[in-house]
């Protein structure tokens, strides 16, 4: 087997479930070495026509593969094939954050965190300073690009005028308070990209006048970057949701509370200090009178098919979410994910060989 070409080895690995990769890597020394190549792991997982997702069902985190082969076939119900690639069974999960193949999972009871790499099977538990984390705690995950991709976790806490930021160091197994003073507040879900984490933020005392903006936390420098512009003016009542495209681009969904249009923008350039945008999709919401009346929870973009899958509130239960697809020229569809009302999309997923220290 050690004499097989790299192309053939990649083809073999691409057909193996993510959580079974460890057994395949142990087949021979060359395969194990190859599996640690970051350029190689980018091509792992399902074929390019499929999308890997992290979803929660019954407080369990699942790694799923979805094939949107029914897109643009002029049917309202979009037929999909979905299969489970992995599952984190040890604990009930409230939230999942993704960074370069690593998942930061917040437990339902806020008693601890777990960082999990479905590709390598590694996991690492993180304990709070006191008995438990606070329900107002927010988290982010990233890594130091100058230190062998050293993984770090950011915790931040807002209460009235009090703000606290901490970094968890895996080597010392301890939390360190950051000397950071901010005059703005983060209140929406974050997204990690290329080791850094991006947040939607607003000024703490001039919300409506200033509007919202983008902030990046640089895990290498352990500090926030400058204020970055969004391609629109938004306030707290509007829907503004971040997503990522294969750890390469940032996407943002925007729907003004009193407007009939919904927009999705994608970055053409982004780092801790600069950002530029292009409009990916603009949807006339009058075509969907029964949908998207309340803020959606999450979304993902298929750039090649020029569609977006949006998890919107289910009008039957008003507690669960269902996935709907929108695209150019009024294209729409309901995505059949098998009991989709029981699932919650957290983020897209890209496998990686990044190690948890």
Model-derived regions: residue spans:
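N-terminal entry/capping and adjacent linker segments that precede and initiate structured domains
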Residues: 1-357
């Amino acid at each position: 087997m050690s004499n097989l070409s790299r192309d053939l080895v990649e083809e073999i690995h691409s057909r193996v479930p993510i959580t079974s990769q460890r057994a395949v890597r142990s087949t021979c020394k060359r395969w194990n070495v190859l599996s640690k190549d970051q350029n190689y792991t980018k091509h792992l997982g399902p074929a390019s026509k499929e999308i890997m997702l992290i979803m929660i069902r019954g407080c369990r985190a699942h790694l799923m593969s979805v094939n949107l082969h029914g897109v643009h076939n002029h049917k309202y119900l979009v037929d999909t094939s979905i299969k489970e690639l992995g599952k984190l069974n040890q604990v009930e999960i409230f939230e999942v954050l993704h960074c370069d193949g690593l998942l930061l999972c917040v437990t339902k009871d806020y008693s601890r965190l777990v960082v999990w790499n479905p590709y390598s099977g590694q996991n690492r538990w993180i304990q709070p300073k006191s008995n438990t984390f606070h329900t107002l705690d927010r988290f982010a995950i990233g890594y130091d690009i100058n230190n062998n991709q050293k993984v770090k976790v950011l915790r931040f806490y807002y209460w009235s005028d009090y703000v606290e930021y901490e970094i968890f160091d895996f080597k010392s197994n301890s939390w360190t308070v950051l000397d950071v003073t901010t005059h703005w507040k983060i209140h929406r879900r974050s997204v990690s990209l290329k080791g850094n984490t991006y947040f939607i933020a607003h000024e703490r005392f001039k919300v409506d006048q200033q509007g919202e903006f983008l902030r990046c936390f640089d895990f290498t420098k352990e500090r926030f970057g400058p204020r970055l512009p969004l391609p629109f003016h938004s306030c707290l009542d509007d829907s503004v949701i971040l997503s990522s495209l294969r750890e390469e681009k940032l996407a943002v969904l925007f729907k003004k509370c009193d407007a009939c249009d919904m927009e999705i923008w994608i970055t053409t350039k982004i780092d801790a200090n600069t950002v530029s945008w292009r409009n990916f999709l603009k949807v006339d919401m009058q075509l969907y009178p029964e949908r998207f009346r309340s803020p959606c929870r999450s979304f993902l973009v298929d750039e090649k098919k020029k569609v977006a899958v949006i998890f919107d509130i289910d009008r039957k239960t008003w507690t669960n979410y269902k996935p709907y697809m929108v695209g150019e020229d009024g294209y729409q569809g309901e995505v059949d994910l098998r009991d989709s009302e029981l699932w919650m999309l957290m983020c897209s997923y890209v496998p990686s060989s990044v190690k948890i220290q």
